[in-house]
Amino acid sequence: MKDTSLPSTAGVVNKLIDSLGKLPGIGPKSAQRLAFYLMRAPEDQVISLSDTIRNIKNQISQCRICCNVADSELCPICQNTKRETNKICVVEQPQDILALEHVGVYRGYYHVLHGAISPTEGITSQNIRINELMVRLDNGQVEEIILATNPTTEGEATAMYLSRLITPLGIKVTRLARGLPFGTELEYADDVTLSRAMEGRQNF
């Protein structure tokens, strides 16, 4: 990683710049701007931010049903009894739910795998939340599984694996339409593309 420290800046500021620069999507210049913004910001705002970051580690866990992030036993989506109980959309990461919810065309529930099958990285089906998904299918309420894993080599491998597991159960398995460019992560797709991919999903 490129050194973001500034020789003319106090050590504690350089430490902050370095820490911010380790965040995804934050380059050296952005890290410096954020650091100096925090220096100028009101103390209560900085303390509130610090407390919130600390609470993420202390208070956030996983929903016992869908494995989404939650600050109680169930995430807000699983608490919502007005959603369609016969559909589950399977995604790789919690941020994929945010992207799909922002589009607003899907009203079923979700399941978060927290990863994708990747033999090159040593990630197998046992390392992601597939067993938890299969348990959810035992109640006979689910009629459709929507595979919304990323259009990557790992995402496709995971989708194929899940399809082979679920199809024999008599549950309809669909995949997001091919509007997403290969190699794209779901969270970075624009709303129009995601909407078309969800509405045009195909049997898989």
Swiss-Prot record:
One of its GO terms (biological process) is DNA repair. It comes from the Bacteria. Keywords: DNA damage, DNA recombination, DNA repair, Metal-binding, Zinc, Zinc-finger. A zinc finger (C4-type) spans 63-78. One of its GO terms (molecular function) is DNA binding. It holds the Pfam family RecR_C. Residues 86-181 form the Toprim domain. May play a role in DNA repair. It seems to be involved in an RecBC-independent recombinational process of DNA repair. It may act with RecF and RecO. This is Recombination protein RecR. It comes from Dehalococcoides mccartyi (strain ATCC BAA-2100 / JCM 16839 / KCTC 5957 / BAV1). The lineage of its organism: Bacteria, Bacillati, Chloroflexota, Dehalococcoidia, Dehalococcoidales.
